[in-house]
Structures are given as structure tokens and as C-alpha cells.
A protein has these predicted regions:
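Non-catalytic propeptide/linker segments at domain boundaries
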Residues: 1-48, 52-61, 245, 252-273
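Short catalytic helix/loop segments, enriched in acidic residues and glycine
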Residues: 65-84, 277-278
Length: 421
């Protein structure tokens, strides 16, 4: 990844490279990215978000300014612009805050015995429960430390290369027509396949994905955002099949449509806001992360926990990959992380631009990242990011300030085990 901005850089990944199947691949894309960011896995997040304060209840982390707050403003940069730009260049982008602004949420799961939205079809290999725990949405809200991905079961079937295959259909009843993010879940087993097949039917159109189930099991895995019709029919659903190119097993658990409302209870109350407006701490719990990822302060300081959760989620997913080989995790090959802040700042004249600041941390863990490469890779990345941004903004809009390149002790650049800024 870093070679993209500095060929031959001695601080970059060198011969460390992930060259196997990506976590998620859109097989229906009308073009194939052959260079750029193809199959690069990145972690990117917008700053802050609503959090629980023990004395003042649910509140924003940053003050109101220009009729908004940084907790809201940075989402309007990252979600509609930055993430799609990177995805269109071929990247697989993880973000530790909910990315979907849709307030509706529908979860279809095999553990909901009353639902007709979940159906299994056997055409050869049979579906059965696997030994691992899975997702179940058994309650309207969750207390601190409760993990919905430890409350249910997971289904599995032997994979087949034949056209004759079994499938599971997830067909929700949409109360409103609109755009909904689609998240799937599964479990990673020793014999999991690298290309489990999913088909998203949206307003009658079919978009096909392959998901590498050898990584990232036991959490929500984002496929894309699609337009769905109101109601319940086979033209608006998700199908998981046991078709794969290699021998092994396909697992399938719940499928989630829409970002939804916050459902993590703190101090006896949920936030009452869409999940996308909350901090990463609460999304991490809904996404099945262990308490050590988001609850380092044991429920006593959500503000500090939220700051650390963004990086800890990245490490939890990336642990065990070629880029973070020495820590346990989900083996997703995340190789770069970026936190975007607006700093809620302005010039004293209230008119001119304040400019760009980039931050990195090199003085930590003897100056090394988990893979053994130098933390100066983060400094190279931060400098290139700031310099290119200033150049682009100046060329497009006129003068744009170049502030500082800070090498300081900040959580979001200290904790990630990959180059970060």
C-alpha cells in the first residue's frame, strides 16, 4: 500500500504482501480493478460520536460549531465521499462506526423461530448447526458487556463446485422503500472456503459477491448498500449458497439490513439516536467484539474507551494476518488505518481556511509495528497525506494552509498495529 505513494521507501512493507482472496469481492462489478487499491484492506473512520457520560448522560464529544458538531460533520466526509472513492479504486474498507444512515434495521436469523423470513433449501448438501456460537437478537437492548454474537447458532453445509447447490434465503419485510446497507455474518472454521457465494436481490436486480470465510467470522461483514422495495418478496432479499471453487464448508448466520437505531444501554438508557451517530464503542459491541476491545475502562469511562475502540477494532480484525502476525484476531489483512478529524477549528477572522494537520506516533513499542517494520512508515504516510491534500486543495480552491506534521502520542496513531495517521 505504502509503495503507492513512495516507491522504494525503506520504511514500507517490503516483501510483506497479502496475495490471496479478498475479504469481500463484488463479482458483478462491470469492471475489474487490476491495479490501484485492488484487494487492499483499509481501516478508516470518522471522528467521535455520541457517547455516555456518567454525570451528564448521552452527549456529543465535541462542541457545537457552525450549526453542527465534529461528531456529525466528519461522517459527511467519510461516508458519502472518502469510503466510496477508495472502494471504487478496489479497496475493501472497514469502518468501526456504523456507516449506514438508514434508521430502519431488519435482522433475519435462523435463531428467530417465529420468522418466515429465514428459509433453507437443500439441493444436495444439507444444512446443519456447527459447533461455534453465533448471532441471535434476543433482546431489544444490550447491557454493557453482553455479546449478541455469543447468543445464537450458526448453520453450515459442505461446499460444492456443482451447479446443484443448497441455499439459505434471507427475505425481510421492508416497512419502507429505500437504501439499506447489507451486512452478512458467518463463522470461520478450519475448513472454511475462501469464496462463499452471496447474492443480493435488490428491486429485482442481482448483485453477486464472494466472501472469504477463512477470515472475519463472528461479526458483521459489509457487502454494500442497495435500493429495496417496500414489502416482502423474493426480488428483495439475500441468498447464501454452498457453492465455492474449493472443498470445505460454508457457514451462514444472520443477515442485517440497514444501520438502525442505537441499542446499547448505558446508565439505564439507549441514546435514542441512529446507530451511525454513536461512537465506535457501541458499534463494536453490536458487532460481536470482545469486551477487551471496547471496555478497557470497565464501563467507567466511555469517552476514553471510544477513542481506543477505533484502533482496537482494527487490531482485532487484523490480528493473525500477514500484517499483524503476532496477535490473535480475525486474520483480515488490514494494512493501513486513517482517522479523519475536523478539529472543530476556525481562523480568528472566521473566513480563511485553517489548513491541514497530520499526526503519527513513532515513539512506541521500540519504534516497531507488529509485523516488525518501522513505525516511521506512519510518518511517511502522514506526511504524504498532508502534503498531497494541501497541494490538491490549493490547486482547486486557492491557498490552503499547511499546518504541522506532529509525531506525538495519540491513541489513534499509537494503538494501530499497521501504519496509521
Amino acid at each position: 500500500m505504502l509503495q503507492a505513494f513512495d516507491e522504494g521507501n525503506s520504511h514500507a512493507w517490503g516483501n510483506i504482501e497479502y496475495d490471496e482472496d479478498p475479504w469481500v469481492f463484488n463479482a458483478s462489478r462491470p469492471y475489474f480493478v487490476t491495479a490501484g487499491l485492488q484487494n487492499r484492506h483499509l481501516s478508516l473512520w470518522a471522528s467521535h460520536g455520541r457517547y455516555w457520560d456518567a454525570e451528564r448522560g448521552w452527549k456529543w464529544q465535541r462542541p457545537n460549531l457552525f450549526c453542527t458538531t465534529e461528531d456529525l460533520f466528519t461522517q459527511t466526509i467519510v461516508v458519502p465521499y472518502l469510503i466510496p472513492m477508495l472502494e471504487n479504486a478496489g479497496a475493501i474498507v472497514f469502518t468501526p462506526r456504523e456507516r449506514d444512515w438508514q434508521q430502519q434495521e431488519i435482522v433475519v436469523d435462523n435463531d428467530d423461530r417465529r420468522s418466515i423470513a429465514y428459509q433453507e433449501f437443500v439441493n444436495g448438501k444439507k444444512w446443519k448447526n456447527c459447533d461455534s456460537l453465533g448471532f441471535a437478537n434476543l433482546q431489544a437492548s444490550y447491557q454493557d458487556g453482553e455479546n449478541p454474537f455469543q447468543m445464537g447458532t450458526v448453520r453450515q453445509a459442505k461446499a460444492t463446485r456443482r451447479k446443484k447447490n443448497s441455499l439459505v434465503s434471507y427475505q425481510p419485510n421492508f416497512q419502507k422503500e429505500g437504501k439499506y446497507a447489507v451486512y452478512v455474518s458467518y463463522q470461520t472454521l478450519p475448513k472454511s472456503v475462501p469464496d462463499a457465494k452471496y447474492i443480493v436481490y435488490h428491486k429485482g436486480q442481482a448483485t453477486e459477491f464472494t466472501v472469504n470465510q477463512r477470515m472475519g467470522g463472528g461479526t458483521w461483514v459489509y457487502l454494500g448498500t442497495f435500493e429495496f422495495d417496500k414489502g416482502c418478496n423474493e426480488f428483495n432479499r439475500v441468498v447464501c449458497t454452498n457453492h465455492a471453487s474449493r472443498r470445505g464448508v460454508v457457514t451462514t448466520d444472520a443477515v442485517r439490513f440497514g444501520g438502525g437505531m442505537g441499542n446499547i444501554e448505558r446508565g439505564g438508557f439507549v441514546s435514542g439516536l441512529p446507530r451511525c451517530l454513536e461512537g465506535a464503542r457501541y458499534y463494536a459491541q453490536w458487532a460481536g467484539a470482545p469486551y477487551s476491545v471496547y471496555g478497557g475502562r470497565k464501563g467507567k469511562n466511555d469517552y476514553a474507551d471510544d477513542i481506543n475502540t477505533r484502533s482496537m477494532m482494527t487490531n482485532w480484525l487484523g490480528g493473525g494476518s500477514v500484517y499483524m502476525p503476532a496477535i490473535d484476531g480475525k486474520r483480515v489483512p488490514i494494512e493501513l488505518s486513517l482517522a479523519l478529524h475536523s478539529d472543530a477549528g476556525y481562523n480568528p477572522d472566521g473566513q480563511s481556511t485553517w489548513g491541514a494537520l497530520a499526526i503519527c506516533t513513532t515513539d512506541f513499542n521500540d519504534g516497531m509495528l507488529n509485523s516488525g517494520i518501522s513505525r516511521f512508515a506512519s510518518k511517511d504516510f502522514a506526511k504524504a497525506l498532508r502534503d498531497n491534500l494541501v497541494e490538491d486543495m490549493t490547486n482547486t480552491f486557492g491557498s490552503f494552509g499547511k499546518r504541522y506534521l506532529w509525531d506525538r502520542n495519540y491513541s489513534e496513531t499509537r494503538l494501530p498495529e499497521v501504519p496509521s495517521a
